[in-house]
Amino acid sequence: NEVLRRVGDDNNRPLLNVPDPRAEIERLLAVRREAYAAIPWQVDTTGLSVEEVAARVIEIAGVVTLPVRYPGGAPSGLAESTAGRPQGGQYEIYIGDRVLAHVGSLLRAAGAPEGSRVAVVSNPVVAPLYGAQVEAALRSAGFRPFACSIPDGEQHKTLTTVATLYEQFLAGGLDRSGTVLSLGGGVTGDVAGFAAATFMRGIRFVQVPTTLLAMVDASVGGKTGVDLPQGKNLVGAFKQPALVIIDPTVLATLPAEEIHSGLAEMIKHGVIAAPDLFAELEKGIRYSPFTTHHAPFAVRSSQIARALRVKIEIVEEDPFEQGLRAVLNLGHTVGHALEKLSDFALRHGEAVGIGMVAAARIAAELGRANPSLADRIEALLAAWGLPVGCPPFDADAIWEAMAYDKKRRGRSLLWVLPRAVGQVEIAEDVPPRVVRSVLCSMGARCEG
């Protein structure tokens, strides 16, 4: 109808100079459907003025696209059958304001078949905000989406939650041609990704992170998983997404404390390999926009992209965390222990920030970094509203919690120690007395 309306009385249309123009249009659309679907960026101009169409095209032109390459196979030392060996490939990360509206066309361009089911996995906080918009965008691209809900919070990152997702997938008619789309933060992405990796031995997975922490960290790299009572992420799988869609405008509904938590991961990436990003965040303190409960559009696409490039370069070189990728765990050895001891009342970014300060002070105690480095990291974290002291947990309890950390080599804990902004090293020769001394100096409860 729309095509016929636009053509009107224009007779200079040879293909429509037939007895039944409507039937000819339907035939042409059917022939061209797959070609059209392969175009990632599409603008429905129905009812829009020229100015409105131009504005949408300009918006698309501002989207940052980051390719991520990954190899086939599995981590070294793990058995795998030739038939079941994952193939290597590439996916794209799209970063831009209001890119959420294009999730359907981007998924079609990534190879998802028209008419297939899409399980939109979210939580009761995020789903009312963005669920309908995502499902509408999927329907407009010819998909059949359905909503799946999981509880919000790290305490629900369990095998039990994954099992409830399997039930929802089956009830929604999801099959091997379908897609699991995570709409939420890091917990949602970890659980949904693990479910996608294991349901029917693995189906397509898409990440749509809605927290800054997930945007710059959890949504990229293919790590998915759940916790056990003994520790975080002890059960999981590597599952590369088909694509990642990052829309910074959704941060408008995120509390400032959650923005700060994500900034801790951005600061971490700066310490690891992006001194320019670290310096930019230091300069940003002078005009901090985080003065209200919500912080709309405070973080730019370019900053998110810069933080992501650090992780992308590392995970492309070490996709299965066999060596170099371990540097991304800066702050996580102490951080994960503090999260566990707080029953996850401590946000992940907050815990990682404290862990970074601890790692920098350990490096200084060992003579591997100037003490001023720890002061600089601590000052930046504190300026963005993040805690820098250790909660008053017993130092021995913190050490015991670290005993179940995945970052081990034999009986030795692996530590990521900063030597300078933009330079870190992996160490396993850190004496327990040094760790204890640093934790005590930062506020841990110590006796004797």
Residue ranges and their predicted role:
Residues 1-33:
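A glycine- and Lys/Arg-enriched "phosphate-lid" helix/loop adjacent to the NTP-binding pocket
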Residues 30-70, 433:
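NTP-dependent small-molecule kinase module
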Residues 40, 194-284:
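A glycine/threonine-rich phosphate-anchoring loop and its flanking beta-alpha core
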Residues 62-81, 87-179:
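ATP/NTP phosphate-donor binding region
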Residues 71-89, 286-301, 447:
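Intrinsic disorder/low-complexity segments
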Residues 187-194, 215-216, 337:
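Short glycine/serine/threonine-rich phosphate/pyrophosphate-binding segments
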Residues 258, 264-267, 368-448:
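C-terminal charged capping/lid subdomain of soluble metabolic enzymes
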Residues 280, 284-287, 293-396:
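Active-site segments that bind and position negatively charged phosphate/pyrophosphate groups
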